[in-house]
Amino acid sequence: MSAVEIPHPSGCRVYDIRQQAQGSMNLQTAITDGLLSTPKTLPSLLLWDAEGLRLFDEFAHSASYYLRDKELTILRDRSHEIVTVVPAQSILVELGSLQKTGRLIRALEKQQKPVRYYAVDVSLSGLTNSLTELRKELGDLHFVDITGLLGTYDDCVNWISNPSGQDPMSSPTVTFLWMGNSISNLNHYIDSSSLLSQFRLACDASRLRCQFLIAADACQDAQVVRTAYDAQNPTLRAFLLNGLSHANSVLGRAAFSPQDWSCESGFYPEQGQLEVYYVPLRDVELDVGGDRVYRVQRGERVRAISSGKWGKKLMGRVACAAGFQMNHAWGDSAGQYYFYHLYGGTQTFTSGNERVSVAHR
């Protein structure tokens, strides 16, 4: 798992696992490819720079945003049960925000499990700030070692699948922690299955057992979803429009004028999918450089991000397509949010068939 250490003052080791240090070049290509596609899209990765992470955290504290409260309730009531599936002397890799990780790490400490925890983030400042806050929250740790990884999901797949012998943790098991409904933020559940499969195959290549702890939104109440993701909510709008500012930074030019754009959202219960769009208020021409100009008509939707609202049945299909089985689900009392334990098909657990536990408010 080759990586280059990045010096910084957070008190945790941070390694650069990016395959290409100039990640902006990949984003530039993704922007132009998306504007050429039908329908037009922009890469959701634009939303998750350091400022985007800050703005999303502000949005997540909105009264109507039900996911955060439900996830915290499950973590409060069930974290000690959830971490029982994480073996001692193993690796825990978090794909996403560190905002709610502390409860699980404290549960691992209480169970006295030596575990190496890696946090993956595409933003160096976002990663180091989160690690600093996590260390402040947790204080001295005796069993869990915390390390940061700078890179994308694809970089993490490559890091897992190409061990260099430099990593001091000799472990047969890697548990991937994916909270905040991030699994459903890809374009389609097939893409989510594909990414899960890539991680499983990377572990296979390194002779590691692979399992996932995934938190996913199962809410099917259209009114609740539409209220939570109302694009006129100022905090959500600020988060989304920051993605256009980030696009300008990536392109090295003011291709997007945020004042020319509004935001819209639509929930499609039959697909269990929420879509969020950028919509120009007038006809715009986007000069992205290299003599390339893209035209977007007034009212034409450009997809910013997708968010699946997947019930247990669909989540089971996602897992199965990726070569995983569902071992356990921990849910809130309304059945709108779940933590799932998925494991590779050749592994066995004493719990037997899939079980569901409910967390109460």
From Swiss-Prot:
Listed GO biological process terms: methylation
InterPro entries recorded: EgtD_Methyltrsf_superfamily, MeTrfase_dom, MeTrfase_EgtD-like, SAM-dependent_MTases_sf, SAM_MeTrfase_EasF-type_put
Recorded phenotype for the gene knockout or disruption: Leads to a tenfold decrease in the amount of benzomalvins A and D, but not their complete abolishment.
Domain of life: Eukaryota
Transmembrane segments annotated in the record for this chain: none
Assigned keywords, A-Z: Methyltransferase, S-adenosyl-L-methionine, Transferase
EC number: 2.1.1.-
Keyword Methyltransferase among record annotations: yes
PANTHER family: ERGOTHIONEINE BIOSYNTHESIS PROTEIN 1 (PTHR43397), HISTIDINE-SPECIFIC METHYLTRANSFERASE SAM-DEPENDENT DOMAIN-CONTAINING PROTEIN (PTHR43397:SF2)
Summary of the function given for this chain in its UniProt record: N-methyltransferase; part of the gene cluster that mediates the biosynthesis of benzomalvin A and D. The pathway begins with the loading of amino acid precursors onto the A domains of the non ribosomal peptide synthetases benY and benZ. BenY and the A1 domain of benZ are loaded with anthranilate (Anth), while the A2 domain of benZ is loaded with phenylalanine (Phe). N-methylation of Phe by the methyltransferase benX may happen before loading of Phe onto benZ, after loading of Phe, or after dipeptide formation.
Family: Belongs to the methyltransferase superfamily.
Entry protein name: N-methyltransferase benX
Organism of derivation: Aspergillus terreus
